[in-house]
Amino acid sequence: MQKLSNQILDFRGLEKLSTNLCKNISVGDIYLFQGELGAGKTTFIRLLINNLFVLNNLPKPSSITSPTFPILITYELNSLQIYHYDLYRVKSLKELEELDFFENLNNNITFIEWPEMLISLPLNKNHYLINLDMISETKRKINICFKQ
């Protein structure tokens, strides 16, 4: 796994980082977000999704929320899907299979909160592991690693 970034950021810095990341997001990329409750996983994903729409000259989605209860929220971006998963309540890989999780990784962009059950799996795709640690009420330490 190759470390790409290790920064301490406030919200404005997170906005800038999300804008820069979006310029390099490719179809098939998988982003795994780790961090304690309240670390900013959903906030970071919300910024990424909004920026993807802006970069494609499309109106931002009216609402981007955490899929803790539905487990998956899908956003349509031109001819592809953005999948936003929250695996906090998922207890087994069988549950993921029932959601067509592994099939959905192909030809889409996928953001996953609470990916711990996936870390040791061979995802067969480029993926990024993003760890958010709370430093203070307004600052987060963000580590981004890339794996092919």
Where are these regions (language model features)?
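N-terminal pre-Walker A segment at the start of P-loop NTPase domains
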Residues: M1-N20
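Short phosphate-coordinating micro-motif centered on Lys-Gly-acidic
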Residues: Q2-L4, S92-L96, F102-Q148
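Phosphate-binding P-loop
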Residues: L21-G28
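Hydrophobic anchor at the beta1->P-loop junction of P-loop NTPases
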Residues: Y31-F33
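The conserved Walker
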Residues: L37
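Conserved lysine of the Walker
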Residues: K41
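Post-Walker A helix-loop "phosphate-sensing" segment adjacent to the P-loop in P-loop NTPases
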Residues: N50-S63
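AAA+/P-loop NTPase substrate/partner-engagement loops
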Residues: I64-Y83
